[in-house]
Amino acid sequence: MQRRQQSGFTLIEIMVVVVILGILAALVVPQVMSRPDQAKVTVAKGDIKAIAAALDMYKLDNFAYPSTQQGLEALVKKPTGNPQPKNWNKDGYLKKLPVDPWGNPYQYLAPGTKGPFDLYSLGADGKEGGSDNDADIGNWDN
């Protein structure tokens, strides 16, 4: 009867691999953990572009943007007050109003200080101004 020779990894080899994986994890995890903030900013910019497109469609149908008082709600249900919508789309312009990635409502001002309307998120801190992740993200950034 012949004996087969089995080959495998020694305990030392396995420990070396575990140490290498630990070092890689220590280098990679901090890099990955900083990305959620960048992802939230990217989501906010995408939302702002989509809402701005809905506002442009509203203007095409009604010859004016909703007033600040009518707000973004005018994209979901027919607004009251002036300016009266002349040809409001019965299905609305958005199914529902999104909130920014930090859970706050998007801000809307018409006429805007930077264009026909200002549409923006207050950033991570939920307050006007700020820097880095707390900075406002607006349609003037796109």
Curated annotation (Swiss-Prot):
Task: Give the range the annotation lists for the signal sequence.
Answer: none
A GO cellular component annotation in the UniProt record? plasma membrane
Annotated membrane topology is: Single-pass membrane protein
The alphabetized UniProt keywords are: Cell inner membrane, Cell membrane, Membrane, Methylation, Protein transport, Transmembrane, Transmembrane helix, Transport
Which subcellular locations apply to this protein?
A: Cell inner membrane
GO-annotated biological processes: protein secretion by the type II secretion system
For region Disordered, the annotated ranges are 121-142
Cite the post-translational modification comment: Cleaved by the prepilin peptidase.
Highest taxon of source = Bacteria
Spell out the InterPro entries in the cross-references. Bac_GSPG_pilin (IPR000983), N_methyl_site (IPR012902), Pilin-like (IPR045584), T2SS_protein-GspG_C (IPR013545), T4P/T2SS_Core (IPR050470), Type2_sec_GspG (IPR010054)
Which residues make up the pro-peptide?
1-8
Keyword Protein transport present in the record's keywords: the answer is yes
Q: Which residues carry this modification: N-methylphenylalanine?
A: 9
Q: Which residue ranges traverse the bilayer?
A: 9-29
Described purpose of this protein according to its UniProt entry: Core component of the type II secretion system required for the energy-dependent secretion of extracellular factors such as proteases and toxins from the periplasm. Pseudopilin (pilin-like) protein that polymerizes to form the pseudopilus. Further polymerization triggers pseudopilus growth. Type II pseudopilus confers increased bacterial adhesive capabilities.
Subunit organization: Type II secretion system is composed of four main components: the outer membrane complex, the inner membrane complex, the cytoplasmic secretion ATPase and the periplasm-spanning pseudopilus. Forms homomultimers. Interacts with pseudopilin tip ternary complex made of XcpX, XcpU, XcpV and XcpW. Interacts with PilA.
State the family named in the UniProt similarity comment for this chain.
Belongs to the GSP G family.
Name of this protein: Type II secretion system core protein G
Q: Where does this protein come from, organism-wise? A: Pseudomonas aeruginosa (strain ATCC 15692 / DSM 22644 / CIP 104116 / JCM 14847 / LMG 12228 / 1C / PRS 101 / PAO1)
